[in-house]
């Protein structure tokens, strides 16, 4: 099957979708946010660098057990998994102490059946390590460190990036059209800019986390990707795909070498499933909207 036909089949199935939340559009008042809680959960890939920071001299820097357990956590789970689990707790996004309490006491059996799976089992397999490391981070003053050294950098990146509300509205209108007229909830378009990640990922509460690198115009030009592309992509993840579409994706996987090759590549990075469809839909929406770039959006500054 030719790639063009594959894309056509995927996009032909766009209409059997429903928006996860449907309370209307709005003005996107709280688009960018920061979160000490999510940054704390995303710290494990950066544990060595953190321990070398002068702020943690004599605490994390001298705790080999912390580093050993942080490395173990990083080898088993990703920041997106930890942040997704915490997003289900209803806990504060700004209080690291609540993160410590949640991971010390959460019961996997209390989670909704629809979110259980191998990813929860992976988190549970390093539960003791998580509890120890999160407690040590809190005791070492991670909340103060984040307020003094991380948050100012994130706020600076946010303040320098400008988005025209009409541009966001146009994106939501296109996604609403694909969803059969059922709009996304604009209040769900909340993005947490985190200092400890270099990518972006959606959360189960319909928000998503994003690296500040994507707010930087130089990075956007160098890698030909910017925040608005990620915004379209992650908002498409908020849609529920129909069983008909999922069956079609499986049929493509079973019968099409092109699709199977790229799906296997996505699965190797912990993605897969509906990811190929979301990428196809992202390109479709982007083409309908025309070029979306940092320079274009800056023209809308007031």
Language model: regions and residue ranges:
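Bacterial N-terminal signal peptides
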Residues: 8-16
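N-terminal mature-domain "stem" immediately C-terminal to a signal peptide or N-terminal signal-anchor/transmembrane
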Residues: 22-102
């Amino acid at each position: 099957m030719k790639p063009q036909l594959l894309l056509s089949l995927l996009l032909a199935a766009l209409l059997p979708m429903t928006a996860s939340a449907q309370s209307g559009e709005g003005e996107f008042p709280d688009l960018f946010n920061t979160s000490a809680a999510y940054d704390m959960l995303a710290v494990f890939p950066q544990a060595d660098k953190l321990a070398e920071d002068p702020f943690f001299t004599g605490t994390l820097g001298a705790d080999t057990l912390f580093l050993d357990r942080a490395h173990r956590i990083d080898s088993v789970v990703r920041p997106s998994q930890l942040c997704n689990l915490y997003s289900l707790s209803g806990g504060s996004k700004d209080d690291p102490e609540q993160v410590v309490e949640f991971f010390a006491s959460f019961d996997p059996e209390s989670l909704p059946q629809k979110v259980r799976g191998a990813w929860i089992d992976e988190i549970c397999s390093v539960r003791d390590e998580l509890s120890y490391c999160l407690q040590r981070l809190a005791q070492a003053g991670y909340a103060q460190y984040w307020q003094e050294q991380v948050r100012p950098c994130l706020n600076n990146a946010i303040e320098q990036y400008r988005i025209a509300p009409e541009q966001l509205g146009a994106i939501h209108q296109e996604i609403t059209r694909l969803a059969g007229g059922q709009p996304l909830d604009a209040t769900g378009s909340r993005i947490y800019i985190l200092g400890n990640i270099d990518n972006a990922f959606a959360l189960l509460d319909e928000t998503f986390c994003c690296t500040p690198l994507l707010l930087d115009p130089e990075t956007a030009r160098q890698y030909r990707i910017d925040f608005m592309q990620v915004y379209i992509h992650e908002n498409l993840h908020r849609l529920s795909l129909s069983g008909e579409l999922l069956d079609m994706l499986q049929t493509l996987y079973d019968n099409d070498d092109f699709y199977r090759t790229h799906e296997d590549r996505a699965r190797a990075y912990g993605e897969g499933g509906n990811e190929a469809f979301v990428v196809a839909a992202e390109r479709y929406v982007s083409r309908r909207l025309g070029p979306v770039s940092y320079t274009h959006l800056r023209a809308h500054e007031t």
